[in-house]
Amino acid sequence: MSSFVLDKEAFVRRVKRLYTEWRAPSIGHDDALRNLDCIMSIVGVEEDVMYSKSMALQLWLLGYELTDTISVFCSDAVYFLTSKKKIEFLKQTQNITEEGFPEINLLVRDRTDKDQGNFEKLIKALQNSKKGKRLGVFAKDAYPGEFSEAWKKSLTASKFEHVDISTIIAYLMCPKDESEINNIRKASLVSMDIFNKYLKDEIMDIIDSDRKVKHNKLSDGCEAAIGEKKYTSGLDPRLLDMAYPPIIQSGGAYSLKFSAVADKNPLHFGVIVCSLGARYKSYCSNISRTFLVNPTEAMQENYTFLVSVQEEILKLLVPGTKLCDVYEKTLDFVKKEKPSMVDNLPKSFGFAMGLEFRENSIVIGPKCQALLKKNMVFNLHVGISNLTNPEATDKEGKNYALFIGDTVLVGEQSPASVMTPSKKKIKNVGIFIKDDSDEEDVDDKKTAKEDQGTEILGRSKRNAVLESKLRNEINTEEKRKEHQRELAQQLNERAKDRLARQGNSKEVEKVRKNTVSYKSISQMPREPEVKELKLYVDKKYETVIMPVFGIQVPFHISTIKNISQSVEGEYTYLRINFFHPGATMGRNEGGLYPQPEATFVKEVTYRSSNVKEHGEVGAPSANLNNAFRLIKEVQKRFKTREAEEREKEDLVKQDTLILSQNKGNPKLKDLYIRPNIVTKRMTGSLEAHSNGFRYISVRGDKVDILYNNIKSAFFQPCDGEMIILLHFHLKYAIMFGKKKHVDVQFYTEVGEITTDLGKHQHMHDRDDLAAEQAERELRHKLKTAFKSFCEKVETMTKSVVEFDTPFRELGFPGAPFRSTVTLQPTSGSLVNLTEWPPFVITLDDVELVHFERVQFHLRNFDMIFVFKEYNKKVAMVNAIPMNMLDHVKEWLNSCDIRYSEGVQSLNWQKIMKTITDDPEGFFEQGGWTFLDPESGSEGENETAESEEDEAYNPTDAESDEESDEDSEYSEASEDSEESDEDLGSDEESGKDWSDLEREAAEEDRNHDYAADDKPRNGKFDSKKHGKSSKHSPSKSSKDKYNSRDKHHSSSSSGNKSSSKDKDRKRSRDDSRDNGHKSKKSRH
């Protein structure tokens, strides 16, 4: 316990508040302290006790829970009886000499006589306090145990008159100070994160996939989430806990009390009431929300009214107002706005909250006379229960309740501020699901209208060409799928073999360097400042010598975190903060200490006068000013050197470049280098030598690249580009410009990159024509020179270095970083070299590729590269147009790279950590098969559907697609545009045999519709969407890795479902395509 630090300032302040109220009571609604002689509390050992007044008082005063501890507050002294270790901590409370502060006496437990001697001392102290009769206790607190029982017997024998002080102490602790408010804010932030990032998304996923999940399972998941860093806002998980078990209720059975328990019934997709609260440093918070799935207009109206009631209460929470008045005024508001709801309201609208989750004596109810004070924190909750929904189709949806709650802080001005500002309007909690049956009715009408327009205009023979083309595409798709199945079988086996060969390799733990300024006192400087006990900065040894208790103590500059200087009146202050365990560290600062158990200095502040006395050369503060300047200089120099050392520590030592004296060495002049060696861009020359390249800038800077360190070399011509370049992707980083680099590029510009818009131009201007001709000649000249250089290097190195040229015709747009660029495949890589930073993926290093967000209604998708080295971070390319999906698949398939696809974004960091933690277990559970489509017979179904040519209507599919992309067009204009596109010419008319056969098939199909009430939707365009369009998120085995999207789209689309065995299909918008539409809208 000696390592724990007491907040002495808070301890003094709070003890003085307790004694001030005791000596001169000011709380009008409770006078329990008025005639009290002494106060006693005991905290025993009981794991089942989560909240108690004794524990709350102890935490409020000391900041820590001390079990088996008796606290006695007498008129002029405070006594603590506890074990020896805890006494070491409590020694920090002694030697406080403030006026009006009681004396602190510490008693160590004596097990030889079972503390009878200590009990006698305490009872004597109680009897000597004032009259020694009336003892203030917490009547409802009951701790079992031998120690507690023995103390109770001693008290009973002494015949004190017990007075319950629970209410008055609770009211005393109710106004929070700044540190307490900060703790509650952090707890509220965690509550919101768990609710928004976990619970909300989990409920959405359950509804999306139509799964059956029990309420208690969801509750357990919330409790587990508080241990995960992504939900805890960077707070220490050891200081976090749930204030109560999360409550999830649905299906008609609702209890709007925080004593309710999540039952084992499955989640019902109707009204879902959720409540949860986190604790940080024992300070509680709460958030309650209600989700409405397909709510009726009446339900939406009731919910909107409930939100307005809560907003009205917030306006009434003003300091000086009685809580019963707040309740009555709220009741009057409800009677005025919606009198039918008065009987459905709860008995109270909230309660005070802090170290205890619920303070029963301070509630917003009809009988509470307590006055509101600034900085009180309340769990403000309002609800309406026992409501009926006559439009519900099932028994569970007939009865429902609405409930919302927040953690609020009473301020100086109205209204009170909400500390859990999670959105709660109907558009944020309403979930609107559109069934396929409703959608198909609309689609049937649309299809009939399009067919009618087609018959009037007639059909061209282009339809037969499209059908023939489609058959060929289906055959190609089947071959590709078959090849991918073969690759999938090989993937897991090769991965297991590779991991078995690699074995276990552990990273070396980095420890902060233990720097020693002087090995002996003889090395200490003998400067006058040192002798005069002034601050002295030793630049040579990078040490600051500071006077501490009259002794000069050296501190190496690496121990100093930061310094600050301020002038206040006649004094200058210099504050020096040190690194210590528990302090926040920078990204590049080592956080591990050689001796973490040692005693560390946190900060030191020096004060010196600015007043110059007679006879003095300068003011005393000149020493602090000079020290401040020198420390900054030495610190800057030290950090710069450390940064350079960090850059160098992972470097692999390279061989020495062997210069070739041959004058015929391949050489290119007037090249720029990326990244720049210095800030200013300079040209230079690149020359090939015996074992590597050397680049020399005009300033004389040298960069050497050895052949054996080149992983990939690229030559990109200037066709369609403004630069021509050579790019080297290295195996190991090299150092230049004081930084490490794995990608080095040499390039020159072709033509003018910028255009003078103010220049007068003419189509046939001779100067412009001459400039264009000159540019064409320059391009040809540069292309020839670079190509010749590459060929000479390949010949000289005997193909050790081979230059790849990107295939521009195979390129596709994507955003590997912030901006969209053109990604171009090479024979062994996927690259973008024009923009900086470059993007280079070596295909030999790729394990598999996964496509994310492959859905009908989205215009683009993401591509994830998983590397064979599983410890390496996955590479991501965002925003690839959906019409390039088949193109990318075909390229990957030709490179023998396994790919998979899904409708959602996955948490790849979590996936890769799971794999690296237990690779054997991962492959035993199927390995990468979790990314496969959910249906094994999907290919067979697709083939069967593709053979039913008479049921395929390309015009319908295309028009559906067009309507998704350009929804602002009218239906009539869509029909006309599509008809023009399909017919090819307005003059073509008449019907051929294929049209007549199609009409006959349509009549047969219509007959089937009448006989069977399950119409088959038109097929999608397989060329545009490929097999991805058949994937449904409902049964994906990768749900456990899904990352939770933060936003949900609120619009609906008319996309058709291609699945026959599902009554309802729900698709979920990705947060990156909020502008597009989906089958389900969420508000």
Swiss-Prot record:
Residues 988-1023, 1058-1076 have a biased composition (Basic and acidic residues). Residues 935-987 have a biased composition (Acidic residues). The keyword Nucleus applies. Residues 1024-1033 have a biased composition (Basic residues). It is found in: Nucleus; Chromosome. GO terms for molecular function: chromatin binding; nucleosome binding; protein heterodimerization activity. SMART domains: FACT-Spt16_Nlob, Rtt106, SPT16. The modification Phosphoserine is found at S437. It comes from the Eukaryota. Belongs to the peptidase M24 family. SPT16 subfamily. This is FACT complex subunit spt16.
